């Protein structure tokens, strides 16, 4: 604290000894007086003990600092108030308390009676910025600048705008109150809510429609319009005492007798827990469904699959031989690998080894041919296989073809039709008539496909390169001897479709000179006379 006191006195001495002082002799006397006071104080401190000296020094130092702070406040206030003119119109006191520029309280150190808490008036706020941020830095001439005077238009109507409430036409009920929208909570609809609402709306619509129809019928019948239609009209019927299916046998359920005598749950009951499943019957269209074909493979892919299959079979065989399940096979010796397989034995006696190798090759060839002969089908087996294929084709679904041929006097044409029909196992008839010829085929899907191609593509019906049995002079004539112009011969497909059963038991040719003979024969064969009528009404222009 002594050090602080010395610094304070030194600063006072410097101030007193500054060149700005007006009276230098007085300053020298002041210095001498202060030096004398300092020496006396030091002498007094030397006589005081150290503990008391520290306490007195602290108290004296605190008092000196407070005095110095108060002096600085007074000087600052005087200097600040000297630059600002005292004008009541520029500043005004704030009755609410001291506030800063940003509505922040002034530091307690600066709160003094000499510092005025001021706030800018609205007039000054227009021409200057906020005092808190910019007013402190304004110079004196800016603060003293008078407000700008705006010239008013003398022709401008300065009368105050009338209030809406003062109008005689104002209705206070039209005043809208400010409506605030309240917050809404998140609401999740339950599952099936709107479905139930839609069903309820449909039921209500049906009920309204029912009411309208009942009202319309009652009006037509002359019933009063006040007919009450309630929910009872569409309600459930009451449960009868006995079901309608039991009425022909009993009149009341009490006629059954004692329940203990019933043969329903006992061992003699014909009712059990077994379920009878009927035999499934495929529909007709299921038989003609095209079979699913495997994916088509290229030649390279086929070779790869064959190679992999053979490698797997060879690997399995080698595994069985290693496990001792099968005996190992002797080496397959050929003339090309003779030296590689036999080695030293082939070098010792090449002639003998070559003869043995040729013998093994011949044995392998004979064994291969014998196995092929064993796998080959006998003539009876081939015939049985052909019949089985035909039956399988027919079992998949029967189809029918009806052709109308203009001329059929050429024998090779009849021969091709007859042979192909028998080979494919088709049933039907070929009716020869002077007007036109009718051919009917009944067979499976595959056979029908081949016969259709035969009749429409393979046979040239205008070809007469070979003579016919009934030809005369290399000319084709009909049964009555009339010459035929085969260049006009045609073959048309009249009808094609599926049939449920065969109408003919076998394939045959039938000569019918008249139309009645053809119709009567077809009627005898299962009612196929409609084919004749269909072919007769056929027109090539259609």
Swiss-Prot record:
Function: Participates in pre-mRNA splicing and in nuclear mRNA export. May play a role in the assembly of the U4/U5/U6 tri-snRNP complex.
GO cellular component, one term: mitotic spindle
Record keyword Nucleus present: yes
GO biological process, one term: mRNA transport
PANTHER family, sorted: U4/U6-ASSOCIATED RNA SPLICING FACTOR-RELATED, U4_U6 SMALL NUCLEAR RIBONUCLEOPROTEIN PRP3
Protein name as it appears in the record: U4/U5/U6 small nuclear ribonucleoprotein prp3
CDD domains: Prp3_C
Oligomer status and interactors: Component of the U4/U5/U6 tri-snRNP complex.
Compositional bias (Low complexity): 10-22
A Pfam family matched in the record: Prp3_C
Biased composition (Basic and acidic residues): 309-320
Keywords: Cytoplasm, Cytoskeleton, mRNA processing, mRNA splicing, mRNA transport, Nucleus, Spliceosome, Transport
Organism: Schizosaccharomyces pombe (strain 972 / ATCC 24843) (Fission yeast)
Localization per record: Nucleus; Cytoplasm, Cytoskeleton, Spindle; Cytoplasm, Cytoskeleton, Spindle pole
Residue span of region Disordered: 1-32, 151-191, 290-329, 367-388
Originating gene: prp3
């Amino acid at each position: 604290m002594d050090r602080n006191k010395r610094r304070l006195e030194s600063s006072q001495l410097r101030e007193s000894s500054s060149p700005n002082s007006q009276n230098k002799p007085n300053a020298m006397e002041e210095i001498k007086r202060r030096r004398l006071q300092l020496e006396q104080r030091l002498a007094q401190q030397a006589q005081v003990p150290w503990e008391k000296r520290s306490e007195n020094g602290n108290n004296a130092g605190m008092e000196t600092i407070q005095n110095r702070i108060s002096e600085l406040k007074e000087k600052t206030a005087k200097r600040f108030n000297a630059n600002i003119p005292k004008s009541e119109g520029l500043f005004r006191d704030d009755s609410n308390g001291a506030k800063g520029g940003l509505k922040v309280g002034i530091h307690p150190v600066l709160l003094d009676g000499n510092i005025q808490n001021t706030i800018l008036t609205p007039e000054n706020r227009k021409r200057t910025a906020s005092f808190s941020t910019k007013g402190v830095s304004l110079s004196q001439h800016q603060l003293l600048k008078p407000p700008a005077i705006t010239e008013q238009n003398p022709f401008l109507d300065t009368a105050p705008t009338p209030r809406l409430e003062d109008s005689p036409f104002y209705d206070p009920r039209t005043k809208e109150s400010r409506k605030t929208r309240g917050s809404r909570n998140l609401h999740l609809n339950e599952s099936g809510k709107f479905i139930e609402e839609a069903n309820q709306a449909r039921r209500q619509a049906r009920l309204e429609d029912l009411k309208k129809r009942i009202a319309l019928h009652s009006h037509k019948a002359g019933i009063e319009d006040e007919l009450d239609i309630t929910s009872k009209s569409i309600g459930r019927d009451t449960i009868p005492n006995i079901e309608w299916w039991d009425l022909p046998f009993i009149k009341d359920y009490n006629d059954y007798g004692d329940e203990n005598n019933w043969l329903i749950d006992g061992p003699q009951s014909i009712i059990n827990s077994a379920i009878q499943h009927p035999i499934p019957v495929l529909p007709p269209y299921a038989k003609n469904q095209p079979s699913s074909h495997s994916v088509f493979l290229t030649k390279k892919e086929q070779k790869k699959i064959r190679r992999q299959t053979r490698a797997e079979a060879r690997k399995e065989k080698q595994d069985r031989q290693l496990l001792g399940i099968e005996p190992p096979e002797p080496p397959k010796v050929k003339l090309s690998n003779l030296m590689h397989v036999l080695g030293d034995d082939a070098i010792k006696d090449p002639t003998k080894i070559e003869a043995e190798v040729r013998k093994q090759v011949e044995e392998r060839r004979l064994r291969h041919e014998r196995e092929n002969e064993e796998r080959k089908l006998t003539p009876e087996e081939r015939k049985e296989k052909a019949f089985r294929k035909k039956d399988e084709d027919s079992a998949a679904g029967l189809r029918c073809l009806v052709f109308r041929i203009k001329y059929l006097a050429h024998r090779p044409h009849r021969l091709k039709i007859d042979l192909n029909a028998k080979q494919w196992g088709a049933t039907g008839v070929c009716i020869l008539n002077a007007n036109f010829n009718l051919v009917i085929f009944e067979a499976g899907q595959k056979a029908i496909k081949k016969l259709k191609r035969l009749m429409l593509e393979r046979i040239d019906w205008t070809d007469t390169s070979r003579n016919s049995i009934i030809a005369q002079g290399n000319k084709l004539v009909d049964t009555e001897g009339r010459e035929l112009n085969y260049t006009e011969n045609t073959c048309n497909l009249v009808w094609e479709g599926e049939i449920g059963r065969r109408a003919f038991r076998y394939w045959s040719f039938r000569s019918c000179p008249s139309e009645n003979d053809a119709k009567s024969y077809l009627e005898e064969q299962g009612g196929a006379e409609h084919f004749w009528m269909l072919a007769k009404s056929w027109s090539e222009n259609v």
